[in-house]
Curated annotation (Swiss-Prot):
Parts of the chain that traverse the membrane: none
Species classification: Bacteria, Bacillati, Actinomycetota, Actinomycetes, Micrococcales
Top-level taxonomic group: Bacteria
Gene transcribed to yield this protein: atpA
Main location: membrane
Subunit and partners: F-type ATPases have 2 components, CF(1) - the catalytic core - and CF(0) - the membrane proton channel. CF(1) has five subunits: alpha(3), beta(3), gamma(1), delta(1), epsilon(1). CF(0) has three main subunits: a(1), b(2) and c(9-12). The alpha and beta chains form an alternating ring which encloses part of the gamma chain. CF(1) is attached to CF(0) by a central stalk formed by the gamma and epsilon chains, while a peripheral stalk is formed by the delta and b chains.
Role according to the record: Produces ATP from ADP in the presence of a proton gradient across the membrane. The alpha chain is a regulatory subunit.
Any Gene Ontology CC annotation: proton-transporting ATP synthase complex
Reactions mediated catalytically: ATP + H2O + 4 H(+)(in) = ADP + phosphate + 5 H(+)(out)
Sites annotated Required for activity: 375
Name of the protein: ATP synthase subunit alpha
Family: Belongs to the ATPase alpha/beta chains family.
Length: 542
């Protein structure tokens, strides 16, 4: 009986081949990154050498665990912006390439959370589960992947929805001096999306990117959104003023990456950049430290590209791409109402319109302090709801004429009856557009309010009583008629609905409002209120 060999030669060769493959694979894994060293480091920027294969925007890791992103690629050196604490970065420190372009985790779990520009939680609620990673420097959607803006996104603010409408996928700039209500408009717009959250077709995912804001301001925004019940559909990307310039530079791109993830899933996104002036200043500081040649106002030559490649990501996608959208509300802070400065003119030329907030109007208690003369929406009119478009057609012109006539009347000794009526109508329309913050108006309420003002139903109402008249009228229509419900359902102010509205307004005004006024005037007054009542009566007589 012959003995069979235990192992054949082919089996031996196979074992050796597998061993060599595993050894080479382990060697490749052990050497998958290169190691360089820091040549110099100062003010949040480090120059490194020994990494010739670095890519633009590649993430590098210093030996102390701090990350940085490559912005400059020279022949021998690479300029890296440190993303995190800079104190531990010293000359001679090892730094390794990661082979990854700067990216952040994204997913639905980010709703209701506060994260930093790297997607790390800063709200103390633990890690954020993520679905995937998304690069920060991805190309925006191409021309053939888009469609025109045709769906409205309601802010709940009468002055904006009627005269400066915004559509889904639009980029609408909010610009004005500090402390004029820019952030308030953005936050009110987020709050107004609450009613749509229960409808999967209408729901809007909101992102608030705080760039260089005070920590107390960011905490205040979060508190307002929590109290309004809006954090469940909102993500806050927080970059306080104490953060390094690198974080302020990448924060808007991080927010847009989170939003693009939802947009390409066919969802609708609203993103607020508060504000891009501080991002431009951070980028200027980084560029000067990287020894890039300065240009106008010491900004680098590519500062326009900084904002254009960011805001171009806001779009309304075609049906073939899922039909999602990302609406951008960038905020720019001006100095002394100068919108002709470098950064404001750049962003105005990139966006699809601007809402200009005037400090004089704000100080005169006209809030929101929208200057309708130079505020414009270039594409939002195509998305405006029919009923609002019908009632607000001449509103912007009337208010612009009122502002001009008001300025003229300061120097005129006497005005004719037509001019005086125009002044009275304009004053009441301006009063009608005043609105408290965090109190958005539904579309149907806006339609009734503007229609009543434009058709002279408040011309004989004392100026101080205009908002009370509006509140009581809307309450009357809500409780006694179905007009508001029909307006909301129909979306158009039909002839039949218009006749019903006329009858209801006249009935309220004659049978309810004036009866209440008469009863109020019959009530006995306290001694200290008699003088005030005489003043009110004299105003009505005039």
């Amino acid at each position: 009986m012959s003995k069979q060999p235990i192992i054949t030669s082919e089996e031996v060769r196979g074992v050796i081949r597998n061993l060599l493959d595993s050894t080479l694979s382990a060697a490749r894994e052990a050497n998958e990154f290169e190691v360089g060293r820091v040549v110099d480091a100062a003010d949040g920027v480090a120059h490194i050498e020994g990494l010739p294969a670095l890519m633009a925007s590649e993430l590098v890791e210093f030996s102390n665990g701090t990350f940085g992103v490559t912005l400059n690629l020279d022949e021998d050196l690479a300029g890296v912006v440190v993303l995190g604490e800079f104190d531990g970065i010293v000359e001679g420190m090892d730094v390794r390439s990661t082979g990854r372009v700067l990216s952040i985790p994204v997913g639905d779990a980010f709703l209701g959370r506060v994260v930093d520009p790297l997607g790390r939680p800063v709200d103390g609620l633990g890690e954020v589960p993520h679905e995937t990673y998304r690069e920060l420097e991805l190309q925006a959607a191409g021309v053939m992947q888009r469609r025109s803006v045709h769906e409205p996104i309601q802010t709940g603010i009468k002055a904006i929805d009627t005269m400066i409408p915004i559509g889904r996928g639009q980029r609408q700039l909010i610009i004005g001096d500090r402390q004029t209500g820019k952030t308030t408009i953005a936050i009110d717009t987020i709050i107004n999306q609450k009613d749509n959250w229960s409808d999967p077709e209408k729901r809007v995912f909101c992102i608030y990117v705080a760039i260089g804001q005070k920590g107390s301001t960011i905490a205040g925004v979060k508190r307002v959104l929590e109290e309004a019940g809006c954090m469940e559909y909102t993500t806050i990307v927080a970059t306080p003023a104490s953060d390094p310039a690198g974080f302020k530079y990448i924060a808007p791109y991080s927010g847009s990456a989170i939003g693009q993830h939802w947009m390409y899933q066919g969802r609708h996104v609203l993103i607020v950049f508060d504000d891009l002036s501080k991002q431009a200043e951070a980028y200027r500081a980084i560029s000067l430290l990287l020894r890039r040649p300065p240009g106008r106002e010491a900004y680098p030559g590519d500062v326009f590209y900084l904002h254009s490649r960011l805001l171009e990501r806001c779009a309304k996608l075609s049906d073939e791409m899922g039909g999602g959208s990302m609406t951008g509300l960038p905020i720019i802070e001006t100095k002394a109402n100068d919108i002709s400065a470098y950064i404001p003119t750049n962003v105005i030329s990139i966006t699809d319109g601007q809402i200009f907030l005037q400090s004089d109007l704000f100080n005169a208690n006209q809030r929101p302090a929208v200057d309708v003369g130079i505020s414009v929406s270039r594409v939002g009119g195509d998305a405006q709801i029919k009923s609002i478009k019908k009632v607000s057609g001449m509103l912007k012109l009337e208010l612009a004429q009122y502002r001009a006539l008001e300025a003229f009347s300061m120097f005129a000794s006497d005005l004719d009856a037509v001019s005086r009526r125009q002044l009275d109508r304009g004053a009441r329309l301006s009063e009608l557009l005043r609105q408290q913050q965090q109190s958005p108006y539904p579309v149907e309420d806006q339609v009734v309010s503007i229609w009543v003002g434009s058709n002279g139903y408040i011309d004989d109402i004392p100026l101080s009583d205009v908002l009370d008249f509006e509140r009581d009228l809307l309450e009357y229509l809500r409780n006694r008629t179905s007009i508001l419900d029909d307006l909301r359902t129909c979306g158009d102010l039909t002839d039949a609905l218009l006749e019903r509205l006329k009858e209801a307004v006249e009935s309220f005004k004659n049978k309810v409002y004036f009866m209440r006024v008469d009863e109020r005037e019959k009530d006995p007054l306290e001694d200290e209120n008699i003088g005030q009542e005489e003043l009110v009566r004299s105003r009505r007589a005039n």
